[in-house]
């Protein structure tokens, strides 16, 4: 039994094994079913991640408990640690948690006393999104069969994106060349170690993967929201018809979703032939099945 909190804390061989396992499950291989009870605890809104984990748990024949933090004893002041100890005491084996606090799991892991369930990080603030990273890796590997030498451009709201951070680091480890584009004010300083920040159209036609990120209005400042122009952003940092036409023949378009149509990606291009956005969602179920098997081995 183990946790799944940060994909970059997992060794390369285990990451590749998880990718292969997800693809095997997708091709029809039978899952490793066990008598497991999981709780899904989401402190932030979610459609894809939440429902995808529920679907993965169903496919594994797990029992599920759904808890809304807004109607739980945490509104009375109970800590996350004590909530998890309570859930373990009543028989919960795995807790899938999304939280607005970066690295929420660090305080939990430092706790002493009664046991807690195995932990799966379903996203922590602007920190990490390890299950999204895995499904993105599955999607890229399914397309190209390798990572070494691939050119990947990550575009958009880098500062507030847990997806960008998780993906940039793991793709570097797997041998891809990562570059970034987007507003300079949304370029974290520590991203310099993962790749170069360039104007969007520089080297555009050489990219194998172009990964767009949602503008996270809920995390940017009030002033930034007031000054934001969707039309201007799309012209400078978005996937326009002309940029689509200038992509390599075998390149793919990705986005963790939800997509702001006509902001990050032109409406007509969200489901264009090069788009793998809905394939990512499909792969998310199998990637999360592989993760849930992994934490209960």
Curated annotation (Swiss-Prot):
Pathway: Pyrimidine metabolism; UMP biosynthesis via de novo pathway; (S)-dihydroorotate from bicarbonate: step 2/3. It is an enzyme of class 2 (transferase). Keywords: Pyrimidine biosynthesis, Transferase. GO terms for molecular function: amino acid binding; aspartate carbamoyltransferase activity. One of its GO terms (biological process) is 'de novo' UMP biosynthetic process. InterPro entries: Asp/Orn_carbamoyltranf_P-bd, Asp/Orn_carbamoylTrfase, Asp/Orn_carbamoylTrfase_sf, Asp_carbamoyltransf, Asp_carbamoyltransf_Asp/Orn-bd. SUPFAM superfamilies: Aspartate/ornithine carbamoyltransferase. L-aspartate binds at residues 76, 162, 214. Its EC number is 2.1.3.2. It catalyses: carbamoyl phosphate + L-aspartate = N-carbamoyl-L-aspartate + phosphate + H(+). Catalyzes the condensation of carbamoyl phosphate and aspartate to form carbamoyl aspartate and inorganic phosphate, the committed step in the de novo pyrimidine nucleotide biosynthesis pathway. Belongs to the aspartate/ornithine carbamoyltransferase superfamily. ATCase family. Heterododecamer (2C3:3R2) of six catalytic PyrB chains organized as two trimers (C3), and six regulatory PyrI chains organized as three dimers (R2). This is Aspartate carbamoyltransferase catalytic subunit. It comes from Leuconostoc mesenteroides subsp. mesenteroides (strain ATCC 8293 / DSM 20343 / BCRC 11652 / CCM 1803 / JCM 6124 / NCDO 523 / NBRC 100496 / NCIMB 8023 / NCTC 12954 / NRRL B-1118 / 37Y).
């Amino acid at each position: 039994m183990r946790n799944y909190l940060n994909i970059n804390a997992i060794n390369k061989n285990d990451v590749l094994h998880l990718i292969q396992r997800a693809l095997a499950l997708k091709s029809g291989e039978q899952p490793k079913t066990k008598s497991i009870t999981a709780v899904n605890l989401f402190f932030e809104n979610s459609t894809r991640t939440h429902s995808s984990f529920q679907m993965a748990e169903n496919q594994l024949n797990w029992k599920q408990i759904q808890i809304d933090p807004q109607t739980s004893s945490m509104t009375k002041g109970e800590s996350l640690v004590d909530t998890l100890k309570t859930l373990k005491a009543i028989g919960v084996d795995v807790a899938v948690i999304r939280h607005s606090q970066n690295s929420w799991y660090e305080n939990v892991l430092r706790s002493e006393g009664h046991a807690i369930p195995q932990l799966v990080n379903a996203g922590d603030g602007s920190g990490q999104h390890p299950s999204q990273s895995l499904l993105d890796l599955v999607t890229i590997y399914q397309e190209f069969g390798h990572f070494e030498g691939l050119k990947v451009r990550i575009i958009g709201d880098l500062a507030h994106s847990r997806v960008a951070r998780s993906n940039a680091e793991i793709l570097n480890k797997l041998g891809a060349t990562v570059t970034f584009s987007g507003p300079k004010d949304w370029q974290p300083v520590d991203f310099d170690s993962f790749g170069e920040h360039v104007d969007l159209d520089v080297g555009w036609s050489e990219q194998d993967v172009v990964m767009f990120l949602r503008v996270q209005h809920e995390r940017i400042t009030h002033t930034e929201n007031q000054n934001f122009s969707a039309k201007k952003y799309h012209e400078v940092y978005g996937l326009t018809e002309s940029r689509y036409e200038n992509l390599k023949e075998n390149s793919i378009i990705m986005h963790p979703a939800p997509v702001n149509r006509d902001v990050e990606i032109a409406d007509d291009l969200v489901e264009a032939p090069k788009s793998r956005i809905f394939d990512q969602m499909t792969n998310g179920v199998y990637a999360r099945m592989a993760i849930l098997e992994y934490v209960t081995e």
